[in-house]
Amino acid sequence: MTTVDASPGISRFEGISSRSVTVATICSGPCSGSRSHSRYHWVPAAAGWTVGVIATLSLIASVSPLIRWLIRVPREFINNYLFNFPDTSIAWSFVLALLAAALTTRKRIAWLLLLGNMVLAAVLNAVDMAANGNTPAETFGENLGFAVHVVAILLLVLSYREFWAKVRRGALFKAAAVLVAGDVIGILLSLGLVELFPGSLARQDRLPYVANRVVGFALADPDLFSGKPHVLLNAIFGLFGALALIMATIVLFQSQRADNALTGEDESAIRGLLELYGKNDSLGYFATRRDKSVIFAHNGRAAITYRVEIGVCLASGDPVGDPGAWPQAVDAWLELCQTYGWAPGVMGASSQGAQVFRRAGFNAIELGDEAILRTAVYKLSGPDMRGVRQAVTRARRAGLTVRIRRHSDISANEMADTIARADAWRDTEFERGFSMALGRLGDPADSDCLLVEAVDRDDHVVAILSLVPWGTTGVSLDVMRRSPQSPNGTIELMVSELALKGETLGIARISLNFTMFRAAFEQGAQLGAGPIARLWRGLLLFFSRWWQLETLYRSNIKYLPDWVPRYACYEDARLIPRVGVASVIAEGFLVLPFSRRGRVHTGHHPAVPARLAESGLLHHDGSTPDVSGLQTADVDLEVANSRIPEQVRVRLAKLKTLQLNGIDAYPVGHPPSHTVAQALDADDEGTVSISGRILRIRDYGGVLFAHVRDWSGEIQVLLDNLVLECCCIADFTAAIDLGDIVEMTGNMGFSKNGTRSLIVRNWRLIGKCLRPLPNKWKGLTDPEARVRTRYVDLAVNTESRNLIMARSCVLRSVREMLFAKGFVEVETPILQQIHGGATARPFATRINTYDMDLFLRIAPELYLKRLCIGGVERVFELGRAFRNEGVDFSHNPEFTLLEAYQAHADYLMWIDGCRELIQNAAEAANGTQTLMRPRIEGASGTANHLEPIDISGVWPVKTVYEAVSEALGECVDTSTELATLRKLSDAAHIPYWPHWDTGAVVLKLYEHLVENRTDQPTFYIDFPTSVSPLTRPHRSKPGVAERWDLVAWGIELGTAYSELTDPVEQRRRLHEQSLLAVGGNPEAMELDEDFLQAMEYAMPPTGGLGMGIDRLVMLITGRSIRETLPFPLAKPH
């Protein structure tokens, strides 16, 4: 039970807007997966409605003389010939109402009672029919009644299978004792009344008459008694009988709930599941509430807690346990609902839980949102937190301090005082809550719960919060109370202190109250909201006068929480009113006599699966079991194994056998004496030990051949029973599968066919492979599978290994050449406050500590230039860059980039430097200054093989305008008008934006007509100034910048600049770029004031180079970027 800070002592569950959801929806009748209906499926409902109508008329007639007089004739006919319908008997009305409800919900015991009644009535009618002296009217009535009874009996017998629902266990003897005692008291009281007001009733008939009215439901014929008392006494006598029945029913319902509530073993199992899987469910701990019942999935790895109210089975939030077993838990719950004839409904499911219920045939509607505080980002600063900040300040000025402790750190006396305060400050008689409240405070089993107290100057506690665990790093609000004398801002102070101290307490998330219709309040208050949204918000504000709809919304939103939606799930909307009432009862807004809310274990029938119960892991006191044992417990081997492929099951069985035999399948490693390549060249006399993965096995009985591969190569090993020292070949085949990693020791030799082999004397398993390798000849043929399981591809595919080695050779060659020229390698920040250094769309992230947006760098240029300003004359960085752009043959969002800067140099110097870097890298990877290109074969132009292309020597150099002019067949230079360039673009069908200048249009023409059509490596120099914001203007050619791009086979490999060192011009250009960024261009660079300030300290004339290493590896190997990267970004399955 909790209260919000709207006013002292307001209940957290004071209205349907409280955290405990009081609106749910259900399915009617049997649910998903229910048994098929026969042609008589309508009989239960028809019987229930018929009996229900009689019960209603009987009750009305018992209290209204007018109604009794109006229906006297049909009532007497029904009573005499069809069904018992006495003139006044409240007790009988109550019995019929219970029977009608039971028939409607298909209870088999109701079918049996109605069938017995019909059989008895038919027998009595048959006896009357056999008697002589009946009038024609009596004969007609008896014949009609007999026919009706026979038809009813036949329908009930034929519809037997439609009444499948059972009744839960209960204290029948105890309820019967209450009924007998109540009837005796009712008879005595009625006898006293009839002695005082006998009317015309004869003295000798008074006791039988009273007994008939109290116990016999007035079913005996009134003509059997001499005289009768006043008609008002008849109603009172029936009321005494009804009260006795009601008390007996209450006792039965109480015993049903108590007997079927959580047992200690049930709670222990739930706590174990929460320990393993509860980190994502903020309401998971409330599943341990002890007046709930529970149903487990058959494998014991998930459970649903629920409560039954007026025939509605309300599931409380998400299933608890392994999300993979949630569907099995839902199936078990629906089967239980069907067994007892309950209508299922779900209250407060999360998005993930609602999806599971939806797949089971339910629909979902959003009820509201749960407020979640993230302690890492919570702060009191900022304009949006002004209200909370002021409230906290007021509370602190009033002398309040906050004390935070675990329940386990609180003494018994202090906890007793805390419980007393919570009860005293509660403004309702009973504790409320069901789906989002624990219903107990200070229980020893809840030692991990957190208690937050507000203490005044006199050390008096004026408010308390109690929060239950949410995984290991979160807490969820359970109790919120404050004294009526507490100062304003008390709750804000407590919540803020808890959030601000979250890191110290190990708390990352705080779940606060639940807010109904939060979206309606927000959307209705927005500027420009439609009339329907405003009307809906107005209605909610109107009802907030009685229920805390807006109050809870306002009390939560001021903390700026994350809103997490919660849902109600249903199958059939026809029973929504009934489920609404059931929800109100479950949450405690409507307190029925049998709604006892237990704090101790009262259940007598554990719901945990038998195998789990017999494992001995669970505790009778409900405490958390040994989680490691629970995790490895073989609860249901068949169900667990049904999801594992056959080959994996076989390998797991082998692993288990090895473990039982004391063999460690994953031992500590010892370096082998030789690699495979070294072993092949080793002397036959020496002992050789190798280790590697088994790729192939050929067993010939006494001799076995296997192929073992390590990083250096592949070797054949030979196992001979005559040579093996410690075991035989049968032991090897029993333990080893393809893919296992083994250690082999022996001598080098030759097989009979002359193959160089290792003759094994001893072997050892050092890594058991639990999944089979792909086809030994084809390997992984699916390109996506090769990307997603690169580790498997490397294990079986030599080509993939060669690509890894080629990439390593390229990186080493580039570094060594730069080192040889006196360059210094540095590392600059990857997380940057401003995205700059290139025009590209960045990846954005956020640092919680500083509450600041950051970007993954798109280039290290601006930081490297800072180093140049500082005097590092030759500097380079070889590292990762990130650009949030497309993914294709030559692009990956994460890539390796080389940037190098040399003082007292220009862009022309880097032409030879870049060419030498690439030629040396190609020689390091391929052995010669060649790169690999696909060879086109056949008329279809299919590229089947790679062929080397010589790239030695000097590469051609062209200006951009010269290359564009050649492609267009018309001269273009810096003086060409924009209109002319647009006409040329239109003629070449190249698109452009209307706001582009001449430089941008020329660049677009270059990209389409020149870059995409270039084959041999070519340097294109002198780009338009407007598209090179960081480049120095050309020293002699106006309108162009000293920049070149290296292009080969349609791919840009690198670029170099004569760097712009004029700080005034640099500021002007970056300012123009920042205006583009403000205007919505996501690729434009932002203004970096720190960099501009550094430039004002003067940078020496510098030439800079940028080169994509991934594309360089692509060029040298002839492969796509996804093939050359060990782990390229892949879309999720």
Swiss-Prot record:
SUPFAM superfamilies: Class II aaRS and biotin synthetases (SSF55681), Nucleic acid-binding proteins (SSF50249). It catalyses: tRNA(Lys) + L-lysine + ATP = L-lysyl-tRNA(Lys) + AMP + diphosphate; L-lysyl-tRNA(Lys) + a 1,2-diacyl-sn-glycero-3-phospho-(1'-sn-glycerol) = a 1,2-diacyl-sn-glycero-3-phospho-1'-(3'-O-L-lysyl)-sn-glycerol + tRNA(Lys). GO terms for molecular function: ATP binding; lysine-tRNA ligase activity; magnesium ion binding; phosphatidylglycerol lysyltransferase activity; tRNA binding. Its cofactor is Mg(2+). The keyword Signal does not apply. It is found in: Cell membrane. Residues 1-626 are annotated as: Phosphatidylglycerol lysyltransferase. Mg(2+) 1 binds at D1045, E1052. In the N-terminal section; belongs to the LPG synthetase family. PANTHER family: LYSINE--TRNA LIGASE, CHLOROPLASTIC_MITOCHONDRIAL, LYSYL-TRNA SYNTHETASE. Its main location: membrane. GO terms for cellular component: cytosol; plasma membrane. Residues 627-1133 are annotated as: Lysine--tRNA ligase. This is Lysylphosphatidylglycerol biosynthesis bifunctional protein LysX. GO terms for biological process: lipid metabolic process; lysyl-tRNA aminoacylation; response to antibiotic. PROSITE patterns: AA_TRNA_LIGASE_II (PS50862).
